Amino acid sequence: METLLGLLILWLQLQWVSSKQEVTQIPAALSVPEGENLVLNCSFTDSAIYNLQWFRQDPGKGLTSLLLIQSSQREQTSGRLNASLDKSSGRSTLYIAASQPGDSATYLCAAMNSGYSTLTFGKGTMLLVSPDIQNPDPAVY
């Protein structure tokens, strides 16, 4: 009986380890000119997710939630932002249309697995949007 119980505990531990979520974001940093449409990528290892969220973090500040995609959804849109979710391939993409210097921040994706109450975060993508200085606003002195 003890052997059976030991095997059951070992099996449960292996199941927990094998189902541990890993979230990866590539590239780690991205620099684009103002006005460019851009794509940020996120991949996750366990497709049994409850939802996936995209956040932004400005230097020295906390996280700001941008979009949340439930596992039953394929995409979410808010203004110039659009996030897609493909559970079968373990990928999510955040599209930012007509980038602006104010979009410069670190963008993070996080997956919440079914049955768990914790988010697993990627390491983030640091985005720098360079202003268009070819047509600067006139300065009045």
Please report, for each region that a protein language model flagged, where it lies by residue.
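N-terminal Sec-dependent signal peptide, specifically the hydrophobic helical h-region
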Residues: 1-27, 108-116, 121, 134
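Surface-exposed, proline-enriched loop/turn segments that connect beta strands in immunoglobulin-like
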Residues: 24-29, 139-141
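Short beta-strand edge segments in extracellular beta-sheet folds
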Residues: 126-130
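Extracellular/luminal ectodomains of metazoan preproproteins built from arrays
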Residues: 131-141
